[in-house]
Amino acid sequence: MEIKTNRLCIRRVNRSDVLHIRELNKNDNVNDFFGSVPEADRAEAFRDSNAVEKLFTLMESNLDTDNDIFYGAWKNDTLMGFIAIVNPTSHTPGIQIEIAPAYHHKGYGYEFLSAILKHLFETESFTYIQYLVMPTNAASIALVEKVGGALQKPGSFIEKLLIRVYHITK
């Protein structure tokens, strides 16, 4: 499966992609970068100093399973982001997106997410996807709302403080 957009080539991430990305990030630059970002601005997943390596390990371990599906978006042979479909066979599959900082605020996230949603709804027979976002992540909230995500009423006060749940339907 390969999806071409105006600026991107999108496909499932394979083992050699993960190994290549891991090799590119083998030095401590990426972990150093996350260490230099103020803790309040770092996503929970990246508060650990080895978060990037753990992410690659998770991606690699799930490549041959139905647990999660990873899609990458390449621009001119450079991986600019990935999308993970979490629990794709469940009744409440989730979606997560990461875009490299150099591509922020240029429409790449929308282009990538829109293409993947179209693929999931039209080709993979998905009818519903859940998108979780921190209330302070304005860019992610704007992105999910732009693709038609509907904010769900929080189930608890704690949920209201910590997370926003959006539903994206076909």
State each model region's role:
Residues 1-101, 160-170:
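GNAT-family acyltransferases
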Residues 28-29, 124, 148:
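Structural motif
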Residues 72-73, 109, 149:
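Small side chains
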Residues 100, 131-141:
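Conserved beta-strand-loop-alpha-helix junction that forms the acyl-donor binding cleft
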Residues 105-119, 138-146:
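Conserved acetyl-CoA-binding loop-helix of GNAT-fold acetyltransferases
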Residues 122-132:
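Conserved GNAT acetyl-CoA-binding A-motif
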Residues 132, 148-165:
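Conserved catalytic-core motifs of GNAT/GCN5-like acyltransferases
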